[in-house]
Amino acid sequence: MSIVVLKLPDVKVKSETRPTHCPSCQGEILQRWGGQVRRVRDPQVSSAQVYRYRCCRCRHTFRHYPAGVDQAQQSQRLRKLAALCWRLGLSYRGIAAVLAAFRVGISRMSAWRDAQEMAGQLKRRRIWKPVRVLGLDGAYVRAWGGVRPVLVAVDLGEKQPVAIGYVDEYNPQAVRRFLEPLVKRLGVSVIVTDDLVHYKTVAEKLGLEHQICQFHVRRWVGRTLKELNSGLPQEWLWVIDEIKKLMAELPLEGSKRFYELWKQIPIGRHGRMHQPLSALDQLRQLLLRLSEHWPQYRVFDWQPDVPWTNNGTEQVIGRMKMRSRTVRGYKTQPGLLNGLMLAGTSPE
């Protein structure tokens, strides 16, 4: 059984060091200018000694707090603990009840603000962190009286969410507006997505390598071949076996081979508009699609750090959906995006 250790910030009663410089002018000659005992909301510490210092250069005075204490009434440890409790499934009312058992009283709104603060810290921590391989996928969550679309971007190296946008993945213009700043800021060079055609269009416009999730590809190809197996003429069943072999081996020349197979299938729809496709016509379409998208199926083969599936993104979205089912519904767009960011982040 695996054990997860969650480290919370330490809270000191008194600062063990003096400040090294003035925050205004960076002056190094500082004079202690009084102090006071401040009450703190924390499970273990009830008060802390806060000193004020005066800079001898600019005469600016400032407070110097002990570790784990800042301007807020709650300690950093309590705020992180409240956000962690929400991440693990407690409601804001439940968080207040649990902390009351430790003789620390906070309101539901304080717990909500703690969760929003933690989500903001996660965003700021990752806003400039380089990401080479980015996973993208859409999700639908319950918010303000309906089901809302969101687009989730995940660092597939660390399996952590990077950004979440209120974007419909079926709108290529919106996807590009969401993705382009991330590409420029983080240095993204490869995206991993499902087989939705809009992602291919956006990747080409932004000059990105595009890996299509092999799980999605093999699933829809397998379903299509199963349907065609019963409708194809007997003399063309060997093509199905050839497709299965190519999908299993993923050879470099697969695109050329699919195109050769496509040219061998006779055209059977001349003059038959608005009629259902025959099994041979469906086979031709399948071969042409596989030939055109073959480079996007095997980027992982020549770039070792690119995964061949988008499972990392799916896992993050799974955590988001599990938490969204236990909340009453997000009321605002910022609350929705912050809640999903916090829920999708695995404990560090």
In which residue ranges do the predicted regions lie?
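Short metal-coordination and nucleic-acid-contact micro-motifs, chiefly zinc-binding Cys/His arrays
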Residues: 14-21, 48-51
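Short, cysteine/histidine-rich loop/knuckle motifs that typically chelate Zn2+
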Residues: 23-27, 57
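Cys/His-rich metal-chelating microdomains
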Residues: 28-29, 61, 98-101
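Basic, short loop/linker segments at the boundary and entry of helix-turn-helix/winged-helix-like folds
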Residues: 31-85
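RNase H-like nuclease fold core
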Residues: 54, 101-202, 209, 289, ...
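Short, charged amphipathic recognition helices of the HTH superfamily
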Residues: 88-99
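Acidic/histidine-rich catalytic cores and adjacent linkers
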Residues: 189-196, 200, 205, 234-348
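Inter-helix linker motif
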Residues: 207-227
